[in-house]
Amino acid sequence: MFFESRPIVGVGGGGGACGGLLTCVGRDAEGKGGADTLGREILELFLWWLLCAGLTEGICGLFCGTFGAEAPDNGSGGAGDDGTMGIGGAAEDGISGIGGAEDEGILGTAGAGDNGALGMGGAATDGTAPGIGGALADGEGLVLALLLICFNFGIPPAKISPNCGAPIPGIGGADIEGPLLLTVPELPEADETTPPPTIGALLSLVSAFFSFIPFLMSPNRASRPCITDFAGLGALPPNAGGGGGGGGAGAPAISTIRYIYGRLLQQTVVRFLVVCFVSYQKLSS
């Protein structure tokens, strides 16, 4: 038999380049080099940064912006004379939301009162049974209180004893010399309509954040790298060269994403610690 005359050519596959942060170069259906932009990873990285930075700065503003007794107009939410306010407001009649400061000492989270009956993060002038994270008049126990909050609210490591078994002044407990227990503020008998202080919303927010982050960091959520198939060989005469192999697949970018996210998280934690240190210095002075 005679073979039909054909050009002596080989069907070559497109070469693939190693993928970096932004692009992975591989072979498309026609044997040409194609690029796949990792837009999904970039979007997730941006959302991680917003979520982490926003929550951290919010906690800083909540626990560091309203320390000290009778601190008016702290945080966000403004102040109201009638006691109806948002987060971070100050009231005169003692009915406040999260982060409020008032004269009667009936308050929510991170408030400050004169009579020592307060919620979490408040400061009492007389030092009577402050809640978790409360600072006394001289600012004692502020930094350790913040560590206590981190250890007990789901931020790793959660199993470390916050006080190493020793009573700490300014951290919850009936008395300094008594058992170290969680302080439950008591409402005045004359005001039965005032809701008790609550930290449920804050706990839910922190717990949801640290439960959601591991899913964002899962390798299964990363976009697949470009996969190159081998070039198909057509019906060629025996003297025709074989086709070139397909290009290599692009390298996955999940390791790069984790590295950048770790750096952003580290910077955010450093900012949080700096704010805590500055607040402690102000209270000490």
UniProtKB/Swiss-Prot annotation:
Query: Which superkingdom does the taxonomy of this entry point to?
Result: Eukaryota
Gene disruption: observed consequences: Leads to overproduction and excretion of inositol into the growth medium.
Instruction: Provide the protein's localization.
Output: Membrane
- Cellular component annotations (GO), alphabetically ordered: membrane
Keyword vocabulary terms for this entry: Membrane, Transmembrane, Transmembrane helix
TM regions (residue ranges): 197-217
Bilayer topology reads: Single-pass membrane protein
Q: What is its main location?
A: membrane
Q: Further remark, if any?
A: Partially overlaps VRP1. Disruption phenotypes caused by deletion of this gene may also be a result of a defect in its overlapping gene.
Q: What is this protein called?
A: Putative uncharacterized protein OPI9
Q: Per the UniProt entry, what species is this protein from, by scientific name?
A: Saccharomyces cerevisiae (strain ATCC 204508 / S288c) (Baker's yeast)
Identify the coding gene. OPI9
